[in-house]
Amino acid sequence: VYMEPQAEFETTKQAIRIKQLFADFEADYCVLDTRNAGVAIYDALAKVLYDVDRNVEYEPWTCMNDDKLKARIVIAGQKEVVFSVKASLELNSKIAVSMRDSLNNRMIELMVSNQEGVEELQRLYPEYVSADVDTQLFYERPFLETVALINEMIGLEYTVQNQTNLIKIEERPGARTDRYTSVSYGNYFVSLLEADLFSDSSGYEYVTLCN
């Protein structure tokens, strides 16, 4: 699991960064929270985007599981890669169970600790040692984000609702769940994809998603 914080609030820039990562990791799907401000990011992803930094034009995307969302923007050549998530109490419970099962069954591989990551960086990139602090932090950021994810998950509280038996996850006061939410949404989509592909007797290949 690779993660990075998104500090940019302008939707078009966020969409371009998503498509950069999608291209970098040769991903096949993008799992997107389309509630509230997320729908604006979807609208940007659904259009042709030009990346000035990389001098690349990105093809438009469209939604694969929500016809209403798909109909918001229709452009020729759209690629059906966006899996929309609009969480409800019931869906959140399914996502929590799926995430728990994946962790228990060691089906998710996180990046190594920051200390191990720094050791690997020193071994693989000699220039890292003499680089300035900002450059070193750039290389270390994914490992630091992994540590933050683990801390988020440790701080979560699981409760089972008496009447519905649904699982509700709550963060402790002052805590965040952004990283957990992102990873758990992606994991839930993978579980659906896996179930669908396993039902196909023709077999399948592993794919990469961008969340």
Where are these regions (language model features)?
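Acidic two-metal-ion nuclease catalytic site recognized across multiple nuclease folds
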Residues: 159, 176-211
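Amphipathic alpha-helical interaction segments
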Residues: 69, 133-137, 166, 188, ...
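Short, solvent-exposed helix-loop connector elements
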Residues: 162-173
